[in-house]
UniProtKB/Swiss-Prot annotation:
GO molecular function ontology, one term from the record: structural constituent of ribosome
Protein name from the UniProt record: Large ribosomal subunit protein uL10
Leader peptide range in chain numbering: none
GO CC terms of this entry: large ribosomal subunit
Domain of life: Bacteria
Record's function text: Forms part of the ribosomal stalk, playing a central role in the interaction of the ribosome with GTP-bound translation factors.
Keyword Zinc: no
Organism field: Buchnera aphidicola subsp. Acyrthosiphon pisum (strain APS)
Keywords: Ribonucleoprotein, Ribosomal protein, RNA-binding, rRNA-binding
Amino acid sequence: MALSIHDKKIIVSKINKISNTALSAVTADLQGVCVNKINELRKSGREVGVKMSIVQNTLLSLAIKNTVFECLKKKLKGSTFIAYSMIHPGSGARLFKEFSKKNTQFKITGAAFEGKLLSILEINQLADMPTYKEAIIKLLLTWKMLIAGKLIYTLSAIKQKKETS
C-alpha cells in the first residue's frame, strides 16, 4: 500500500529530527537478510542507544538534506537500512560490523561522522573506538601500571641505597 503525502512528511520530519541530534550514521544493504534477524538487530540497537529505520531512499535523501549526514546521499541505493548513533559515535558502526560478521548478505554501504563520508577503513576505526566507559577503564589501568612501576623503581632504589651504605 502506498503512503500518503501526509505520512511521507511525517516520516521525513521524524528522520530529520533524529539526523539533527545523532552523532553518526551508518547505512547498510539488508537484501536477503531474514526479518527476525533484523528485529534482533533493532532490539540490540535500542539497548545501546542506536535508532534504526528502513526508509525509502527518496524520503531519506529529503530527511538528511541540510544536515551533517547529507554526504550519505551518494550511498543511497537499493534497500537502505540506516542506524543513527545517539549516545556514542561508534555504536551504530560497531553494531553493524558485528552483525555483518554473522550475516554475510548484510553489507555496510556507508557511514558519516561530523559531516564527512567515511571509507571502509574509517568505518572500522569508528566501530573499534572505545566508549567513554571503556576509555576511562583503560586510563585507570594505565595509571595503575605507572604507579606500580614507580613503586617498584622506588623500592629498588631504596634497596640499592641500603646495600651501598
